[in-house]
Amino acid sequence: MTAQTMQIGNRPCRICGEAYAEYLLLQMTGEHELQSMDHEVAMIAQSSRNFLFAAIPVESWNDALSPWEAPAVWGKQGFGGKAGDTLRFLTEQVIPTLKQQFRLPENVKIILGGYSLAGLFALWASTQTDLFYGIAAASPSVWFPGWMEFEQQHPMQTQRVYLSLGDKEERTKNTVMAAVG
């Protein structure tokens, strides 16, 4: 499967897969994740499902993927609370563009995935809209200040959730991150 780069909005999105796909897989990515993207797509391709995979680059993770503003948990960079803007970019630009360019059916099953803060973004996005058929959150940043209270009051609207959590956070000396355990 050959990957191509497609400019959507002002972002160079990496696209791999087939037109008329049954599944649209969206992954918010950082530069460091692009190196393993080919392997990830190859693993997904082993399923018998037709899919289109789109890696959407995120420049400022702490701002673009955080659902609300929060102080720094480590280092000096806090969280900008711009997840709403990122979700609008997905729903108003990325998804319509991919549906049109790759002739995806109206009922294409859209799965949003991410790792770390992008995993938290995926979980949060599923509380904001019923657009997503599924969510894949790998080691999501559920330690994020206020997340536990938020998720108890805002149910997910997705049909399927894949969630994987590590066990290192609970052993850290950082009290915010240790709350995960």
Where do the PLM segments sit?
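The feature captures the conserved acid-bearing segment of alpha/beta-hydrolase catalytic domains
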Residues: 141-181
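Aromatic pocket-lining residues of Rossmann-like dinucleotide-binding sites
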Residues: 125-126
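Short beta-strand immediately N-terminal to the catalytic nucleophile in serine-hydrolase-like folds
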Residues: 111-114, 138
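Serine-hydrolase catalytic machinery in alpha/beta-hydrolase-like enzymes
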Residues: 9-12, 19-103
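The conserved beta1-alpha1 loop
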Residues: 26-30, 139, 165
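A conserved short beta-strand
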Residues: 131-143
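Short helix-loop-beta connector
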Residues: 105-108
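Gly/Ala-rich beta-loop-alpha elbow adjacent to hydrolase catalytic centers
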Residues: 113-118, 122
